[in-house]
Amino acid sequence: MRGGHKEEFMPDVEKRNEEIVRAFFETLSAGELEKLRLLLHEDATWGIMVTGIQGAGDKHGRKEIIDDFLKPIREGLFIPANPKVVIQHLVVQGQYAAVEAKGLGKFKNGKDYNNRYAFFLEIKDDKIFHLREYMDSYYVSTL
């Protein structure tokens, strides 16, 4: 079962939105930021819903999300194609999706990264429109 429906009875919009969410996290995990840019709605927002860590707060639009937020983290701190976002649970209802995931990877300094996440997404026009990210911010503050 996915999203409260047996898969064979999942409405087409929910199947499509599940595919969009899975493609988004696969592309993010691969570090393919230019491809990721195309999966984001032009008016996308990405909210880091924690306090007290670098990067917390809202990011608006593709440029800020990719160039000012994701690129410095992924290319500055981690080895290529890290960290991976591994979906553990995905629930889709209409244009909304909830994801429980693990972030696994390796920093350039050789240290391992292993964090837990919850993401809440809204899809609009077959693109990621709004994303809210929750994580273990205490873990991040100790790195």
What spans do the regions from the language model cover?
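A solvent-exposed, acidic/Ser-Thr-rich amphipathic alpha-helical stretch
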Residues: 41-89
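Short, flexible active-site loop motifs that bind/organize anionic cofactors or intermediates
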Residues: 23-26, 55, 80, 130
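Short, low-complexity N-terminal intrinsically disordered segments enriched in polar/charged residues
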Residues: 1-39, 142-143
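A beta-strand edge to alpha-helix "cap/lid" segment located at domain peripheries
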Residues: 2-13, 74-143
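Hydrophobic pocket/interface hotspot
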Residues: 21-24, 35-37, 44, 65, ...
